[in-house]
UniProtKB/Swiss-Prot annotation:
<dbReference type="Pfam" id="PF01171">
    <property type="entry name" value="ATP_bind_3"/>
</dbReference>
<keyword id="KW-0820">tRNA-binding</keyword>
<dbReference type="InterPro" id="IPR000541">
    <property type="entry name" value="Ncs6/Tuc1/Ctu1"/>
</dbReference>
<dbReference type="GO" id="GO:0034227">
    <property type="term" value="P:tRNA thio-modification"/>
</dbReference>
<dbReference type="InterPro" id="IPR054306">
    <property type="entry name" value="TtuA-like_LIM_N"/>
</dbReference>
<dbReference type="InterPro" id="IPR056369">
    <property type="entry name" value="CTU1-like_ATP-bd"/>
</dbReference>
<comment type="similarity">
    <text>Belongs to the TtcA family. CTU1/NCS6/ATPBD3 subfamily.</text>
</comment>
<comment type="function">
    <text>Plays a central role in 2-thiolation of mcm(5)S(2)U at tRNA wobble positions of tRNA(Lys), tRNA(Glu) and tRNA(Gln). Directly binds tRNAs and probably acts by catalyzing adenylation of tRNAs, an intermediate required for 2-thiolation. It is unclear whether it acts as a sulfurtransferase that transfers sulfur from thiocarboxylated URM1 onto the uridine of tRNAs at wobble position.</text>
</comment>
<dbReference type="GO" id="GO:0002144">
    <property type="term" value="C:cytosolic tRNA wobble base thiouridylase complex"/>
</dbReference>
<dbReference type="GO" id="GO:0005739">
    <property type="term" value="C:mitochondrion"/>
</dbReference>
<comment type="pathway">
    <text>tRNA modification; 5-methoxycarbonylmethyl-2-thiouridine-tRNA biosynthesis.</text>
</comment>
<dbReference type="InterPro" id="IPR020554">
    <property type="entry name" value="UPF0021_CS"/>
</dbReference>
<dbReference type="InterPro" id="IPR032442">
    <property type="entry name" value="CTU1_C"/>
</dbReference>
<dbReference type="InterPro" id="IPR035107">
    <property type="entry name" value="tRNA_thiolation_TtcA_Ctu1"/>
</dbReference>
<dbReference type="GO" id="GO:0016779">
    <property type="term" value="F:nucleotidyltransferase activity"/>
</dbReference>
<dbReference type="GO" id="GO:0002143">
    <property type="term" value="P:tRNA wobble position uridine thiolation"/>
</dbReference>
<keyword id="KW-0808">Transferase</keyword>
Length: 343
């Protein structure tokens, strides 16, 4: 006997929604998925009418669905946004060169202007050359740092008001786990924020897909027949994030709600006033936002150019060492006070 769509539209169900377990037809799934993203955007006031927004486009499922849905919602709900695509070419043969063809297809399909910036033109290096220098153990550190700054550089060139990234619920839950496991309180503070950055010296980043499950994004792209690039980065298997992802998938098997549980827990975390926040400023070399002097991108680039590629890896800045020392001293004083009060 066929299962009928739970939305009571009368149609036969075509899928079981991962997030809720509801049996839905394709059209009702599309409507629910799009409505949730619209609610996320409107309830969080992610955009203002008249703003220019850059969609960080990689050609993958997340950025492709993000571009498609933002264009659709912008027209349906009259957001009044000017949407553009911003893509970063890291210089990874057999991966990024192919995915950029998909980005160009997105440009044509959604009629959005596209800007492509490469590591080679920004830094004088490609990831292929960097990996040849350092091996595969720390390549994601270089790529992540350079990519974040490259997006800022591209956004500044385009004169946009914000950058919309395709981070989904799974990504954010993984990041919470990674930061807990690493004891990185600075990143743990902001990793669940739907908006980061902003202010006079930086362009804010927003995450419209923050509460969207990865499985649902794949289903949406599949049933909508969207064109996206599905090959994993050739350097990704060695990434630390992969271990957090595998752990999360194991947890999800025994507790299907674990993704949202972790996100909500991250949102509710409170930090002691004694835990210092890193102060954000402007790098004295490149002029872009940084919490250290010089910024991490400049330190890594200097190491590459000097033939010392591991110069900036695994080392803390003087400021970070001072903050760590202050936190350690405060913890020791608190412990001493507790012992004193026990007597």
């Amino acid at each position: 006997m066929p299962i009928i769509c739970k939305s009571k539209c009368g149609n036969r169900a075509a899928l079981k929604r991962p997030k809720t377990g509801d049996a839905l037809c394709k059209e009702c799934f599309f409507a629910a998925f799009e409505a949730e993203i619209h609610h996320t955007i409107s309830s969080s006031n992610l955009f203002r009418r008249g703003e220019k927004v850059a969609v960080a486009a990689s050609g993958g499922k997340d950025s492709t669905v993000l571009a498609h849905v933002l264009k659709l919602l912008n027209e349906r709900h009259n957001y009044g946004l000017e949407l553009v695509l911003l893509s970063i070419d890291e210089g990874i043969t057999g991966y990024r060169d192919d995915s950029l063809e998909t980005v160009k297809q997105n440009r044509d399909d959604y009629q959005m202007p596209l800007k492509i910036l490469s590591y080679e033109e920004l830094y004088g290096w490609t990831m292929d050359r960097i990996v040849a220098q350092i091996g595969r153990s720390n390549n994601c550190t270089f790529c992540g740092v350079f990519r974040r700054q490259a997006l800022d550089r591209g956004a500044k060139l385009l004169g946009v008001d914000s950058i919309a990234t395709g981070h989904n619920a799974d990504d954010i839950a993984e990041t919470v786990l990674m930061n807990v496991l690493r004891g990185d309180t600075a990143r743990l503070r902001r990793c669940t924020s739907i908006r980061t950055g902003g202010g006079e010296d930086s362009i804010p980043r927003v995450k419209p897909l923050k509460y969207s499950y990865e499985k649902e994004i794949v289903m949406y792209a599949h049933y909508k027949k969207l064109v996206y690039f599905s090959t994993e980065c050739v350097f990704a298997p060695n990434a630390y994030r992969g271990h957090a992802r595998a752990f999360l998938k194991d947890l999800e098997k025994v507790r299907p709600s674990v993704i949202m549980d972790i996100i909500y827990s991250g949102e509710q975390l409170r930090f002691k006033d004694t835990v210092k926040k890193p102060e954000r400023g402007t790098c004295t070399r490149c002029g872009f936002v940084s919490s250290q002097q010089p910024c991490k991108a400049c330190v890594l680039l200097e190491g590459l150019n000097r033939g010392l590629p591991k110069l900036g890896i695994g080392k803390k800045t003087k400021g970070e060492r001072m903050i760590a020392k202050q936190n350690q001293e405060l913890a020791l004083r608190e412990r001493a006070n507790l012992v004193k009060n026990d007597f």
